Amino acid sequence: MPTKIEARLKRKNRIRKKLSGTTERPRLTVYKSLKHIYAQVVDDTTGKTLAFASSLSKDLKGQDEGDKKADAKRVGALIAQKCKAANVEAVVFDRNGFPYHGRIAAVADAAREAGLKF
């Protein structure tokens, strides 16, 4: 019986077979650890990271530290802001094998509210 991590990696690989970011619509991938959340926008055709944000970012350090879900919302808004600065309007959302719930959904919703198209 696979462990939780092995099952997530299996889901991740199954999703990544079908999901790929292009220059027009790069891939917004999200990773969460027990304490922090990370988001990056990747152009898979060139293999370059176009934008990156995490709950450890210096841009978010001065803000009031709340719960993890509030941190995820701030990361979603920050990644959308950095995408606009990099002239990225639309992305493909890669949940990285995590269930679309809680902090993962909070990042996606905040990015949508900030004007990023999925």
Swiss-Prot record:
Biological-process GO terms, alphabetical: translation
An example molecular function term from Gene Ontology annotations: structural constituent of ribosome
Disulfide bonds: none
GO cellular component, one term: cytosolic large ribosomal subunit
RNA-binding as UniProt keyword: yes
Keyword line: Ribonucleoprotein, Ribosomal protein, RNA-binding, rRNA-binding
Superkingdom of this protein's organism: Bacteria
CDD domains (UniProt xref): Ribosomal_L18_L5e
Job description of the protein: This is one of the proteins that bind and probably mediate the attachment of the 5S RNA into the large ribosomal subunit, where it forms part of the central protuberance.
Subunit structure: Part of the 50S ribosomal subunit; part of the 5S rRNA/L5/L18/L25 subcomplex. Contacts the 5S and 23S rRNAs.
Family indicated by similarity: Belongs to the universal ribosomal protein uL18 family.
Protein name stated in the entry: Large ribosomal subunit protein uL18
Source lineage: Bacteria, Pseudomonadati, Myxococcota, Myxococcia, Myxococcales
This protein's encoding gene: rplR
